[in-house]
Amino acid sequence: MSEDKSGSFYSMYKLCGQLEKESSHSGKTQLIKSFCNVFKGDLYLLAKLMLCKEDKRVFRIKDKAMLKICSHIWDCDLDDMIEDLDNGDFTETCKKFYIEYGKYPEKSTLTLKEVDQVLDSLTVSGKFEDQVKIINKLLKRCTPFDFRLVCRIIDSDLKINTGAKFFLDAFHPQAYDAFKKANNLKGVIEKIQQHDFDNDNGDGDDGDGDDNDDDDGDGDSDSDKKKKKSSGGSGSDSGSKKKSKSFEVAIKLMTPIKPMLPKAVKTVEGVVKSSECFYAEIKYDGERIQIHKDGNQFSCYSRNLKPLMPWKVDEVKPYIPKSTKAQQMILDGEILLMDTKTSQPLPFGTLSAHKKNGFKDATVCVFLFDILYLNGKSLIHLPLKERREILEKNVMVVKNRIEFSEVTIVNGASEKSKLTALLNRVFKEKLEGLVIKDAMSEYEPGCRHWIKIKKDYIHGMADSADLIAVGGYYGSGSMGGLVTVFLMVCYDKQNKIYKTVVKASGGLDDNMIAKLQPKVTSTMTKISKEVSKIPYWLDCPKQYAPDFIVKDIKQAMIFEIESAEFTKSDHHTTGYSMRFPRILKIRHDKDYKTATTLEELVEIGKDIKIVPVGKGDNNSPTTTTTTTTTTTTTTSSKLIKKQQLSDDDDDNDKDSKQQQQEPSKLKFVSDDLLDPFNDKSDDESNKIFILNYVDNSGIWNEKGLSGAIGKKWPSIPKSFSQGDSNIIKSGEIRVEKVKDDSISTNKKVFICNLSCIIPPKSKKESYTFSLKEFKSAIKEAKGAINQKKASVHLAKPQFTSPSWSELDEVLTKELYNSGIKVFVHSISKSSPTTTSPTTTSPTTTSPKITSPSSSSSPSNKLSPLKRGRDEKLEHEIIKDIEPSLPIFEDVNAVIDSKTIDQVDVKRLINSIKTMGGRVSDKWQQVGIGKTTHLICNGMSDLYLHVDRLGGTIVLPNWVDQCFGSDKLLPLHEDYIYFNKKDHPDYSQSSSSSSMSIEEEKIVVTTTSDDPSEGNQQQQDKKVIKESKIIQSKDHSSTTTIDTKITITSTNNNNNGNDNNKTRKKQHLLSIFQECIIFLHDNVNDRETLKRYIIAYGGDISDSVNDKTTHLVASLPNNFSNVKPKDLFKSIINNNSKNNNNNNNNNNNGIIVNSLWLWDSINMSDLLDVKNYKLF
């Protein structure tokens, strides 16, 4: 048997350890270069294992499967391993339990070749018994640290933050580019060895000056990319081209090439500026396929460069030789299911469904869009225009089996309308989107130099719904131990049950995930995916059983979920799901009753959104002529057929048809609604009516459009609120004239308040917009508008019902048809400095309004907020008026039901929760469920308890006032409850002074029994200060509430006269009376705990001495790595020396877990320490 010279696996382990510690890019590359200069093993094997993310082998073992194998070998509890896995990385779990197992070699003897052979054997071993044998054999040769590294290779993540670029740049500056193009690691390594590590720029820098390794996959700076586009080449100079050519690695048949990819843009403008001439290709909603043909042999690869499953391609394989006579070729395309009756692609996911059920009228079809290799020659350096010609000359269309992608040639910005029309057609036909390609561009493997534009990329066109988060799942990797994925559901009114829609995690950053954990802990209970523990009110499939489930649906969080589209799904119990879901925000203003229902979800899914036609588009039609180089007739006939089909669909959808044939007669503009006479205004009228929506309560709304009006013209809300005339009956109007010196004397603005908002009958309900009252108010307003010969300006209301088309119909019928001009204000598509009115479709977004302070400066205009649907609503207009956080976000209140009526208790609970706060049943001073406010209106035991602990105690009217004013009010004496008369801790003095609550000094006195103290006052604990900082709603200021409690110790002979009220000696309970306690620094919330100990009769020791009775630390009972005595070792040793010097007895007390203190407090009794002893 020949000697294994592949190299030591332990040496690779040491290299990984160094790379994990090194943070700089150049440092990592230098470490690799230094290591490989002395490495005598197989460099290709080393590269193969180090670049495990590039290894396309399928090992058939996931994290929990590996734990199951290991638990079987080590005879340990699988549940314990899974529980440990919940805390993070499964590779760490494997290492930890391997160490506990104890039977492992002391020294690593594995070689790289042996590890590679083990990995190869795992790719062909699908049975559990075979996998156990392979892993068991491996474990006999490797240490726990070796095994962790093997597991990381299997998991394709070495956790060293070192990609292919870092590794290959250590050898040659062109090595990574060659690898990207050919995806042939062995060929690259052989080339490196031929160059004998000659490296002119092997510092690991990608040459773009941005310290980014894999940001775009091409290593170009922004300026380089611009050069690349202008030149039509790769963006390199002639010298670098020469270098690249000298290092070029040939494309190899049957070795997949990294696909060229598109990057996202969010506007049509961003596309048309990308090139003077580009191909706009239909983006088919299937799976990427790369076909390699070598004679009669075929291989098909996925986007991830892995072989496609045979069942996906077997149907279409026989048609490949029928479509071409070429012997060798590499084709790029998309595989999907085609409806043979309509010749229309079927939605994403149907290909998998076809495997199980089969579709009678559907076939598997490949849409080809590129050719990379032909008869021994690479074509990737040719421009796209030439490659497309070669593709169409060498491949013939086989109907519904082999097709070409549909292409529209667009000549830059001059043909923007053609692109807009094509997009509208794509979205209406529910295709995925478009891919934009520069006609003169090369094929650059792994680079994102194409552009993709999809519905969910265009601002506001994505589908969204407010769903209920009823379950949570643990994250993985660095997010292990945190709940990062949520099970989203909606309510099925017909069947009276909650049904699943989607699992969502995207959209949350690390900070938001951390913020959500306390909410998860307090409102959810752990069920560890046990189906039997799913509540009766939730219809949840077994495979979606979560790690956590909400305790009470009323406490569930509401998330706004945005997605590319709604799709039908057999996996979720609603029958629907969402593609590419992401969490936009938490809806603190909604609860389980006001979240999207299943019926509403179905309606949202029917919605077809249209891209606004921009200025100069001349109302282009929604169809377009498409051409390719040689298949113009085929493409055009297909387009006509698709247009006929879309027309047929319109017959079934009256509203959609009407919208297409009869566009809105109203004028959609992008001007500032509150500045209608600006220079850019398209309105020539000298008198303007601005419509404002109000209710019949007589109270001016300080939010939304009303709030913006009040800020700019304060006289309007003031006039509105004067006398009894401020109450406007539903369906009626009231007109207020604007007084503004900045408006020319010959021009006038009127605010027309329409009473069409119906206020809620209770706090549980919400405001609604009445179409009936809106019609009535508009009819009444028409007379006033005609009398003044004015035009009308308005914003779309903030309500999703009624629909805008219904309001459009009323405005058109009553105003436009009566000769009144109507302007609907929307978001500008251009920059603030060049904003101009644009005529758009009715689905254009809503108005932009500047704040009063910035109205004169276009550059200071507020940017529009993100829309959740296709229409931006009124409440999204002003960012200052609609802050993102609820005003009671940091409030967790306890309501004293003994001092407040039950009716008021319910009202307070609803108010607090509506404003984003929480309500708890009992007072909790610290921890996740820490309470912040006690709400009471009289003397009670609960009041005394919280008062003695220095808690914040408020009257119910504070909550009511905050709710009414919609802002967090500062706590002053009108809101703070403090009962001095009946308080048992206070004694009356003959000459007590009347002091305000802020000025009053509260003194807690105790009587000393030690005669040696004489008349000297001893201050035991001087000041305990608790400062509660409550963020105000707009985050611009904070309210600080300081509670100072001075605790002094005075002897019986104190002759001082105190005219203020003084507290008597008073303890809640004397449960710690005999205890002198030392708190270690690691104890959580030490200051609060000190206060509790003192309040409950105990004493605090600042150092360990012979009088100390208890030493307290925060450690779990089942600690393993830290010995509790070690925590106090230095303290005890120092104390022992002092005691020996003083000839004192050495009694250091008992070391106990801090839980002993908390449990004793909660049980109101001194518990036995034996269950809490740590030493």
From Swiss-Prot:
SUPFAM superfamilies xref list: ATP-dependent DNA ligase DNA-binding domain, BRCT domain, DNA ligase/mRNA capping enzyme, catalytic domain, Macro domain-like, Nucleic acid-binding proteins
GO biological process, one term: DNA recombination
Single GO MF descriptor: ATP binding
Comp. bias (Polar residues): 1004-1018
Database matches in InterPro entries: ATP-dep_DNA_ligase, BRCT_dom, BRCT_dom_sf, DNA_ligase_ATP-dep, DNA_ligase_ATP-dep_C, DNA_ligase_ATP-dep_cent, DNA_ligase_ATP-dep_CS, DNA_ligase_ATP-dep_N
Location(s), subcellular: Nucleus
Known catalytic reactions: ATP + (deoxyribonucleotide)n-3'-hydroxyl + 5'-phospho-(deoxyribonucleotide)m = (deoxyribonucleotide)n+m + AMP + diphosphate
Biased composition (Low complexity): 622-635, 829-859, 987-996
Region (Disordered): 195-243, 612-669, 829-869, 984-1036
Pfam family of the protein (one): BRCT
Binding site for Mg(2+) 1: 334
Extent of Acidic residues compositional bias: 199-221
Residue ranges annotated for the BRCT domain, each copy included: 883-976, 1067-1174
Keywords for this protein: ATP-binding, Cell cycle, Cell division, DNA damage, DNA recombination, DNA repair, DNA replication, Ligase, Magnesium, Metal-binding, Nucleotide-binding, Nucleus, Repeat
Cofactor requirement: Mg(2+)
Superkingdom of the source species: Eukaryota
Cellular component GO terms, alphabetical: nucleus
Binding residues for Mg(2+) 2: 432
Gene3D superfamilies per the UniProt record, alphabetical: 3.30.1490.70, BRCT domain (3.40.50.10190), DNA ligase, ATP-dependent, N-terminal domain (1.10.3260.10), DNA ligase/mRNA capping enzyme (3.30.470.30), Leucine Aminopeptidase, subunit E, domain 1 (3.40.220.10), Nucleic acid-binding proteins (2.40.50.140)
Keyword Metal-binding tagged: yes
Free-text function comment from the UniProt entry: The alpha isoform interacts with DNA-repair protein XRCC1 and can correct defective DNA strand-break repair and sister chromatid exchange following treatment with ionizing radiation and alkylating agents. The beta isoform does not interact with XRCC1 and may be specifically involved in the completion of homologous recombination events that occur during meiotic prophase.
Family recorded in the similarity comment: Belongs to the ATP-dependent DNA ligase family.
Name of the protein in question: DNA ligase 3
Organism: Dictyostelium discoideum (Social amoeba)
